[in-house]
Amino acid sequence: MHKGLLVAVVLALSLPAIAQDRGGGAGAQGRGAGPAGGRGAPPRPAAGNGIEVGGWFGRLDDPKESRTGLKFVTMGTGLHATTGPNMILFDADEDWEGPYTTKAAFTMTKLASHEVAYGLFVGGQDLDNDKQRYTYFVIRQDGKFLIRKRTGATVANVAGDWTDHAAIQKPNAQGSQTNELAIQVGRDTVTFLANGQTVATQPAKAVDVVGISGLRIGHGLDLQIEGFSVTQAK
């Protein structure tokens, strides 16, 4: 990623990137130069726009959408996201290549009005411009998952449509749903896990694996996120 471009985007608000001052807030663990070569994150301007976690950016799927209701904050031992529009959230320092694992535990605190997805993304490149690309692994409250690639404004399913899997916990009687998701990037294979169980595997060449890792969150959700981390595989 070109750091200068990302700064320009935030300052000019000419693309759908929004950010908050870095300021030492909580968030990704193991922050610093990822194995992708120490590109690091650019300095953040002290803007609000609902992103209140130090060092994190947000990018809306549609820059014309209203940010009304968007809030991303630290809460307890983790992060809390209330949306708002469909978007990704990320710390640009989490820029990785080579074997690594991205994971987080998500609790949807109340039922969504319809089936809305949330989860993780990896391989983020050019997130500051209209050539953005990344691969995301998301679930819904109906217990289904999807793996999809975004290239610019185009999205394509990696392996079929929404699929049921018994490993994905559905909401309880109170409407809360908790699942730990992980993406394990190996040298040749990428494994997608829910609550420690493999739900899918793909050849590494079929998905985006080099770049920024972060969160993918659909519209109108209220999520508590615990233990977001990216770690080098041994």
Q: Which ranges hold each PLM region?
A:
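Bacterial N-terminal signal peptides
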Residues: 7-16
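Disordered, low-complexity segments in secreted/periplasmic proteins that are enriched in proline
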Residues: 19-49
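Short carbohydrate-recognition loop motifs
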Residues: 68-88
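Secretory/extracellular carbohydrate-interaction modules
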Residues: 83-155
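Beta-strand-rich interaction surfaces with strong enrichment in secreted/lumenal proteins
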Residues: 87-94, 165-173, 213-215
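Short tryptophan-centered beta-strand motifs in secreted/extracellular beta-sheet-rich domains
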Residues: 102-104, 170-192
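Short, aromatic/His-centered strand-loop micro-motif at the edge of beta-sheets
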Residues: 154-180
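Flexible glycan-contacting loops in extracellular carbohydrate-active proteins
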Residues: 202-227
